Amino acid sequence: MASKSDKQVTVEVKNNNNGRNRSRSRARSQSRGRGKSVKITVNSRSRGRRQNGRDKYQSNQRVRNIVTKQLRKQGVTGPKPAICQRATATLGTIGSNTSGTTEIEACILLNPVLVKDATGSTQFGPVQALGAQYSMWKLKYLNVKLTSMVGASAVNGTVVRVSLNPTSTPSSTSWSGLGARKHLDVTVGKNAVFKLKPADLGGPRDGWWLTNTNDNASDTLGPSVEIHTLGMTMSSYKNEQFTGGLFLVELASEWCFTGYAANPNLVNLEKSTDKQVNVTFEGSNGTPLIMKVPEASHFARTAVARSSLPTTLARAGQNTTSDTVWQVLNTAVSAAELVTPPPFNWLVKGGWWFVKLIAGRARTGTRSFYVYPSYQDALSNKPALCTGSAPSGMRSRAAVMTTLQFTQMNQPSLGHGEMTATLGRAIPSPGDTFNVVLTIGQPLAPNTLTKQSWLNKTTVSPQNHHVVKIAKDVNNYTTMQGFTPISSVDWYTTDFQPSEEPTPIPGLQVLVNSSKKADVYAIQQYLNNQTNNKVQLTSIFLVKVTTSFQVNNYLSYFYRSYGTGTTVENLKVRSDTTAQDVNFPVGWYLMTNTAIFNAPAPPGWIWQNVELLNDTAYLIDQGMMHLIMPPPANTQLLFEMRTSVTGSRSMISSEEPDTHEPGDEWCDALDASDSRVFLEETDYEDEEDEDEDDEADRFDLHSSYGSEPEDDDENNRVTLLSTLINQGMTVERATRITKRAFPTSADKTKRSVYMDLLASGLSPGNAWSHACEEARIMGTNQMPNVSGDRGHAE
């Protein structure tokens, strides 16, 4: 290059403006769309003799360094790399071809924060960590390594093609079209390496790409590598299709980064695989193309958990969408099996697309996503619009089971945090009240849509059979009467924002012969005055059967008979019963119980266990509306329900003999919270205790630890409780303060015995049982049973 003494190397940098002048205020950025011609002059040192090989190399290297320095000084090569990182990323396996046609097996996006394996985690390596710290990236080289997982003679019938997609945009590409790209054909059973140079990988900003995937798609994604297969994969040893993996895919490259700009949340982008998911597409003329997947699928649950939903409402007839974009890759079934409304059949046939979660919940147990033909369209919220509906003969086809690989493309919030805060969604906590929308399922035999609803009438069952009990413990339970199957449950907050499904209510369960069959998720009670001295209580329970079971019960139904003239009789229960089997498969059910007892009803949750009465008028209250006739399938019921039981107590029906013994209410099963309260109590009161005592002291009441007789304490308890409730205090808090101010003899005895037995080494359960027995003896002067709280001092 500089072998002669008079040799000059000329590199000149000029701006090519195509003869157009621009003012300084309108000058374009040097990093975009400007042609450059380069001219640099280098004078070599004169030498008196011919250069040998070493001198020639040094001279060439000197010239090369000078040229590189001058080019960088003129801004032709963009910013200097701040750090470079070599890494080998394992991306997963290439599966076999199942249809015989062109199938996509992998789509590898080269942005460093997106280069992850599909293991379902957010773990990251050095490349992802650097991508979250720097604003620009580029590749020095890229090698896609395919390591064979089968022998050359083990399978046949399939060829693999690795190709470069410079725009990272889905396209309608045939096998011949893939051959028009830069590509490499690979024979199954042999290792291969697809090599790409910087000229194939350069970005729009002097070879650099932006790292933040929230920016323009054409500046951030970089090129992508797609891997397709053609021809059905057959086993050479068996006359059957081969379904295993063909290649292990690894990415060996050197990423360079520059421009420090920390976006730590970019390392948490998730990539995973849902191997068994039903996918359907919907759309009509002029409406966006919608992809639907089951609400319980891994993809739907992940998208809901990691998507940010706006709280603003959309215009009429429109839906709001999440800000999070997902790339979806279909790798399991032929695109011909997925029925798609026109004109975007090619998009689904291509095997990968982009989606965004639609806010709210579908009412069929599915999650809906808008489909986008490119990442830029997804960022701009321009979904694919259909020009028609799917062919009428294909609309009734069942959903196709497939495998979806999905990648979280962006993170709306780039600051610290494992995941974005999901706006408009609430994570329920115990005690929350929810609006619950129940979608009715098919009637449960023997019920039909054309006849009255059968329900269990009695609290006993035929011989060798058992009733269904919704129970807190052996003393607090109710018998199931009505049973309505539910196909899906939608949870909303009190202001009707979509919410996650809560956990089952601790301590509540559905029992058959002391065996747990279901969990209880939500409850509610409706109390109405039935007559002047009677009240009607209807309890509803939303339960999820975890183990299918069958019961045989005495069934009856409600009926309404017409009187003379314009008078109409109230709802009554048929006195005759029929013993019938009822099967409960796994799933959701709404169970009910209605009871009539003497007024007044105490506050708190009431456990009643009486059978439906003959010749007694029942009111059609809020919890019984669906028990007259079975509601049609897919209709919906709305209830405001609770997710905890507080202040519960048992009631003895006036129709049953009173076998209640003094002290019974103090001997429920010991809960973990009871034990914790006792153990945390000391001789020194904490700040909360002092506040409660102060509230009690304001009423100038005396402690029961003094010399006042027990009957005076009883009057004081009633007075204080009524005063606190009238002042607007909750029943639970008023009861707690009253018990602390005037504990009963049973309270004192139970607490003392319990603490003594614990100190002696007895287990909490046994200590509680013995304390209850002592409290039973001392329970002659008990506090009025205003709630189901335990009888200990709090």
From Swiss-Prot:
Region (Basic) location: 1-72
Family that this chain belongs to: Belongs to the astroviridae capsid polyprotein family.
Swiss-Prot/TrEMBL site (Cleavage) positions: R315, A316, R395, S396, R425, A426, R649, S650, D658, T659
Region (Disordered) location: 1-59, 681-715
Keyword check for S-adenosyl-L-methionine: no
Region: Core attachment, residue numbers: 396-425
Biased amino acid composition, Basic residues: 21-37
Record's keyword terms, sorted: Capsid protein, Clathrin-mediated endocytosis of virus by host, T=3 icosahedral capsid protein, Viral penetration into host cytoplasm, Virion, Virus endocytosis by host, Virus entry into host cell
Cellular component annotations (GO), alphabetically ordered: host extracellular space; T=3 icosahedral viral capsid
GO BP, one annotated term: clathrin-dependent endocytosis of virus by host cell
Amino acid composition bias (Acidic residues), ranges on this chain: 681-697
Renumbered residue ranges of the record's region Acidic: 650-794
One Pfam family from the record: Astro_capsid_N
Region feature (P2 globular domain): 426-649
Segments for region (Inner core): 73-265
Listed name of the protein: Capsid polyprotein VP90
